[in-house]
Swiss-Prot record:
Gene that encodes the chain: CYP2F3
Predominant localisation class: endoplasmic reticulum
A cellular component term, taken from the record's GO annotations: endoplasmic reticulum membrane
GO biological process, one term: xenobiotic metabolic process
SUPFAM superfamilies: Cytochrome P450
Catalysed reactions, semicolon-separated: an organic molecule + reduced [NADPH--hemoprotein reductase] + O2 = an alcohol + oxidized [NADPH--hemoprotein reductase] + H2O + H(+)
Entry's EC annotation: 1.14.14.1
Family listed: Belongs to the cytochrome P450 family.
CDD domains in the cross-refs: Cyp2F (cd20669)
Protein name, UniProt field: Cytochrome P450 2F3
Protein residues bound to heme: C436
Topological type in the membrane: Peripheral membrane protein
PANTHER family tied to this protein: CYTOCHROME P450 2F1, CYTOCHROME P450 508A4-RELATED
Entry-linked Gene3D superfamilies: Cytochrome P450
Length: 491
C-alpha cells in the first residue's frame, strides 16, 4: 500500500472514530467531560500508570458525573457516594448491565456469570446462588468448612517457627480451598499441583490486570493483541485455567449421580442435562467453565488480598492489633476457635475488618457497568449500551461519609457507645444488582480467619511499624499490596 492510500485509510478511520464519539449528541445531553480526540479519545489526559487518580482528578473539574472516552469507547464515570448510590441502588435495573472489559471478556465471551448480560446473566446468577446456598453459603455448614481450613492454616503458621515469611501463598492456599471445596467437592492438600496452579494463575492475572498494561489492553485490545508485553500472558493463563477446570468436569461426568450432587459442578452438569433439548438454554459447557473460573477468581483473590492488606495495617498500627486480641480473649478465650456467632459480641473487631476493607479498597474502580436502556440520570441522558465506571475509591474515601477518610481509623464503624455502626458508603463488594455473589462467604471468611490468627499469634514486621509502606504495588482493577515478609509469634 503506497503512502497516499495509507493516509486516506487513516483519515477515514479518524472520521469514523470522530463520528462515533459525537453520534450521541442527538440523543440528549450527555454528562460533560474533556474534549476527546479521534481514536485516542481522552488518552492524553489520562495516565495508564495511575488511571484511578486521573479519573478522580477529572471528577473535580467536571463533577460527580462526567463523560470520558477510553480510546473510541464512550464511558460515563461516577464519583462519590451519592452519585454511585443513586445509580447502583436507586436506579439498579437501569445500571445492571455489565460493561466491556476486554481483559476478561475476550476470554469468557460473555458466558461466565461475571461478564454475561440479559437473560443469560439472570439465569446463571439465580442458579449459581441457589447452588451456593444449598452447599451452605451463609450457613453453619460452610462455617464448619472454614473452621476446618483454619486449623490447617494455623498449623502452617506454626511451622514458620517465628521466622520471616511471605504470607501470599500461605494465605491463598487456605482461602482458595474454601471455594474449591464447594466447586470441586473436596479440599486440596497444600502441595497439590492443581491448587498451586490455580493460585499462581489467578494471582498473576490479577497483577497484570491491575498494571498499566492491563489498563491499556482494556482501551485498545485489538491493537495490543499484536504488541508484545506481559498482557500476552493473560490469555495463556486463562487457557491453562480452562484446561484445569475442563479436566475436573470430565472427571465429574464419569462419576455423576444426578440424584446425589456432590458439588457445584455436579449441580451444573445436572442442569445442563435437564435442558439439553432446549436450544435457548443458558446452561452448556462454556457457561459452566466460565462461571467456575469466575467463582474461583473471586473466591480466591478477594479474601486473600484483603487479608494481606490487613496484616500490614495491623503491624503498622500495633495498638489496633492488641485491642482486637484483647476482645478475642474476653469474648472467645483460648480454648476454642472464634465462630460467626461471636461477631455480635465483638464490635471493635468487626469495625477493624470493615475499616481494613474500606481503607485497602482492593477493587477501587469496580468492573464496568452498562445502562440497559436510555437512562435519565441527574438531568443527563445516558444512551442505552453506554459503559459506566463507578469509582468505589471515591465512595470509601468520601469525606461526607467518613470523618477522616485518609486515615486508618476503626472508629469510622463505631458509634458513640462503641457499638458497631454500619455505613451505607461501605461498598467493597459493589452494590445493586451486580453485588458480588460471594459477599456472605467472603465476610464470613474474613472474620473467622483474622480472629483465628490473632487468637493464636501476634503479627510482627521486620522493621519499625512506622516504616511500613501502605501504598499498593499497582492500582488498576485492584489495589495489589506490595510483597512483604512478616513474623508470627505464638501468644
Amino acid at each position: 500500500m503506497d503512502s497516499i492510500s495509507t493516509a486516506i485509510l487513516l483519515l477515514i478511520l479518524a472520521l469514523i472514530c470522530l463520528l462515533l464519539t459525537t453520534s450521541s449528541k442527538g440523543k440528549g445531553r450527555l454528562p460533560p467531560g474533556p474534549r476527546a480526540l479521534p481514536f485516542l479519545g481522552n488518552l492524553l489526559q489520562l495516565r495508564s500508570q495511575d488511571m484511578l487518580t486521573s479519573l478522580t482528578k477529572l471528577s473535580k473539574e467536571f463533577g460527580a458525573v462526567y463523560t470520558v472516552y477510553l480510546g473510541p469507547r464512550r464511558v460515563v464515570v461516577l464519583s462519590g457516594y451519592q452519585a454511585v448510590k443513586e445509580a447502583l441502588v436507586d436506579q439498579a435495573e437501569e445500571f445492571s448491565g455489565r460493561g466491556d472489559y476486554p481483559a476478561f471478556f475476550n476470554f469468557t465471551k460473555g458466558n461466565g456469570i461475571a461478564f454475561s448480560n440479559g437473560d443469560r446473566w439472570k439465569a446463571l446468577r439465580k442458579y449459581s446462588l441457589q447452588i451456593l446456598r444449598n452447599f451452605g453459603m451463609g450457613k453453619r455448614t460452610i462455617e464448619e468448612r472454614i473452621l476446618e481450613e483454619g486449623h490447617f492454616l494455623l498449623e502452617e503458621l506454626r511451622k514458620t517457627q517465628g521466622k520471616p515469611f511471605d504470607p501470599t501463598f500461605v494465605v491463598s492456599r487456605s482461602v482458595s480451598n474454601i471455594i474449591c471445596s464447594v466447586i470441586f467437592g473436596s479440599r486440596f492438600d497444600y502441595d497439590d499441583d492443581r491448587l498451586l496452579t490455580i493460585i499462581h494463575l489467578i494471582n498473576e492475572n490479577f497483577q497484570i490486570m491491575s498494571s498499566p498494561w492491563g489498563e491499556m489492553y482494556n482501551i485498545f485490545p485489538n491493537l495490543l493483541d499484536w504488541v508484545p508485553g506481559p498482557h500476552r500472558r493473560l490469555f495463556k493463563n486463562y487457557g491453562r485455567m480452562k484446561n484445569l477446570i475442563a479436566r475436573s468436569v470430565r472427571e465429574h461426568q464419569a462419576s455423576l449421580d444426578p440424584n446425589s450432587p456432590r458439588d457445584f459442578i455436579d449441580c451444573f452438569l445436572t442442569k445442563m442435562a435437564q435442558e439439553k433439548q432446549d436450544p435457548l438454554s443458558h446452561f452448556f459447557m462454556d457457561t459452566l467453565l466460565m462461571t467456575t473460573h469466575n467463582l474461583l477468581f473471586g473466591g480466591t483473590e478477594t479474601v486473600g488480598t484483603t487479608l494481606r492488606h490487613a496484616f500490614r495495617l495491623l503491624m503498622k498500627y500495633p495498638e489496633v492489633q492488641v485491642r482486637v486480641q484483647e476482645e478475642i480473649d474476653r469474648v472467645v478465650g483460648r480454648e476454642r476457635l472464634p465462630t460467626v456467632e461471636d461477631r455480635a459480641e465483638m464490635p471493635y473487631t468487626d469495625a477493624v475488618i470493615h475499616e481494613v476493607q474500606r481503607f485497602a479498597d482492593i477493587i477501587p474502580m469496580s468492573l464496568p457497568h452498562r445502562v440497559t436502556r436510555d437512562t435519565n440520570f441527574r438531568g443527563f441522558t445516558i444512551p442505552r449500551g453506554t459503559d459506566v465506571i463507578t469509582l468505589l475509591n471515591t465512595v470509601h474515601y468520601d469525606p461526607s461519609q467518613f470523618l477522616k477518610p485518609k486515615e486508618f481509623n476503626p472508629e469510622h464503624f463505631l458509634d458513640a457507645n462503641m457499638s458497631f455502626k454500619k455505613s451505607p458508603a461501605f461498598m467493597p463488594f459493589s452494590a445493586g444488582r451486580r453485588l458480588c455473589l460471594g459477599e456472605a462467604l467472603a465476610r464470613m471468611e474474613l472474620f473467622l480467619y483474622l480472629t483465628a490468627i490473632l487468637q493464636s499469634f501476634s503479627l510482627q514486621p521486620l522493621g519499625a511499624p512506622e516504616d511500613i509502606d501502605l501504598t499498593p504495588l499497582s492500582s488498576g482493577l485492584g489495589n495489589v499490596p506490595r510483597p512483604y515478609q512478616l513474623c508470627v509469634r505464638a501468644r
